[in-house]
Amino acid sequence: MSLLEQLDKNIAASGGLIVSCQPVPGSPLDKPEIVAAMALAAEQAGAVAVRIEGIDNLRVARSLVSVPIIGIIKRDLDDSPVRITPFLDDVDALAQAGAAIIAVDGTARQRPVAVEALLARIHHHHLLAMADCSSVDDGLACQRLGADIIGTTMSGYTTPDTPEEPDLPLVKALHDAGCRVIAEGRYNSPTLAAEAIRYGAWAVTVGSAITRLEHICGWYNDALKKAAS
């Protein structure tokens, strides 16, 4: 059974939750052993996969969890806005560290390495390639280039203003076009995650609402302050 077939089976049985275990940078939780513990807790709670950033975090998580890991490396480049797995060496390192799926930025922006080359390198390692996209055009272009999975990860993050709501119409449009879609980006409630499935998502990635304690506390603090004013 291929990994995609196994994931199809697990998603049908468990509902399609993927947990992104990426603490706020510099947080007290931003340590490989804590990231790995989050990943294990997510697996034990029914997540069908986890998304992990960074080689050290991935290696430790891989030693604890049995579900597939979506691996990424984030970089801040001087000459490109692309942050997610921009280099071929990043793909190689993630493959060596134990990622089953490697995600790359799939947007049509200036970049050090072409999306096509990154996807080909992932497939060279016999792993699944995921493209983090911002639009239907991005997603369809990446699908034509061989991406196995299209994520809506970058929707709302390539323009100055980020909306509060997730991009459900993008999920539907990509699904209707024949893409295997992971809905990601601002799915900060079970209701929104469930809505993504109704719109055609194959699975839904949730990050901040589960693993970023500072964000969750901020939401509660803001609501309480507003109620008290």
UniProtKB/Swiss-Prot annotation:
Catalytic class of the enzyme: isomerase
The enzyme's E.C. designation: 5.1.3.9
Catalytic activity: an N-acyl-D-glucosamine 6-phosphate = an N-acyl-D-mannosamine 6-phosphate
Keyword tags: Carbohydrate metabolism, Isomerase
Superkingdom, natural source: Bacteria
Gene3D superfamilies in the record: Aldolase class I
InterPro entries noted in UniProt: Aldolase_TIM (IPR013785), NanE (IPR007260), RibuloseP-bd_barrel (IPR011060)
GO CC terms: cytosol
MF terms (GO), sorted A to Z: N-acylglucosamine-6-phosphate 2-epimerase activity
TM region positions: none
Presence of keyword Isomerase: yes
SUPFAM superfamilies: Ribulose-phoshate binding barrel
Pathway: Amino-sugar metabolism; N-acetylneuraminate degradation; D-fructose 6-phosphate from N-acetylneuraminate: step 3/5
Gene Ontology BP annotations: carbohydrate metabolic process; N-acetylmannosamine catabolic process; N-acetylneuraminate catabolic process
Keyword Isomerase: yes
PANTHER family referenced in this protein's UniProt entry, alphabetically: N-ACETYLMANNOSAMINE-6-PHOSPHATE 2-EPIMERASE-RELATED
Function statement: Converts N-acetylmannosamine-6-phosphate (ManNAc-6-P) to N-acetylglucosamine-6-phosphate (GlcNAc-6-P).
Family recorded in the similarity comment: Belongs to the NanE family.
The protein's name in its UniProt record: Putative N-acetylmannosamine-6-phosphate 2-epimerase 2
UniProt organism field: Salmonella paratyphi A (strain ATCC 9150 / SARB42)
Gene this protein is translated from: nanE2
